[in-house]
């Protein structure tokens, strides 16, 4: 799964991805669950979700969509999370972000296909080291424009 996610971040998202140890530790501590999509014994997608009492949050999702289009790996990964939320008695499934309103964004279109409500609760940003933050913003812009 991490290999599929890494390739997605390298080729399309074009931003740094947390190291694999982040994901392993979240799993070991019981913070995250991994929902894997397999086809013929091979992992072709999946998601990492985190939950509280009423909401399941889809932190990461990926799939080999071009290569395995007849299996719909990204759709199945998200659907698995929605099923987990329902089975756990959660009332919400948060797909974590839909981009800026009015700016074309394929991910938002994908998420909208599942129905539900588009809700913006806002994001909070506390910059502890402004110069380092500005440097990081510049580096991410460079990576995205490659």
Feature names for model-found ranges:
Residues 69-85:
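Conserved acetyl-CoA-binding loop-helix of GNAT-fold acetyltransferases
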Residues 32, 87-90:
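Short, high-confidence coil segments that cap the C-terminus of an alpha-helix
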Residues 47, 58, 78-81, 111:
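Polar/charged side chains located within well-ordered beta-strands of beta-rich proteins
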Residues 63-71, 97-104:
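Short, charged helix-to-loop "capping" segments that act as catalytic/coupling loops
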Residues 3-4, 21-22, 76-80, 106-109:
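Alpha-helical elements of Rossmann-like donor-binding domains used by nucleotide-donor carbohydrate transfer enzymes
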Residues 1-70:
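A conserved beta-strand-loop-helix scaffold within acyl/acetyltransferase catalytic domains
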Residues 90-146:
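Active-site/acyl-donor-binding loops of N-acyltransferases
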């Amino acid at each position: 799964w991490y290999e599929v996610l890494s390739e997605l971040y390298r080729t399309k998202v074009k931003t740094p991805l947390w190291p694999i140890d982040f994901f392993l530790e979240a799993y070991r501590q019981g913070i995250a669950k991994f929902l894997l999509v397999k086809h013929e014994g091979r992992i072709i997608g999946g998601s990492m979700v985190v939950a509280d009492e009423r909401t399941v949050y889809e932190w990461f999702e990926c799939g080999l969509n071009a290569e395995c289009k007849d299996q719909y790996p990204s759709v199945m990964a998200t659907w698995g999370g929605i099923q987990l939320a329902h089975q756990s008695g959660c009332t919400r499934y948060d797909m974590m972000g839909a981009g800026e309103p009015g700016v074309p964004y394929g991910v938002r279109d994908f998420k909208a296909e599942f129905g539900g409500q588009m809700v913006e609760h806002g994001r909070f940003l506390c910059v502890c080291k402004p110069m380092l933050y500005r440097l990081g913003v510049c580096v991410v812009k460079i990576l995205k424009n490659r």
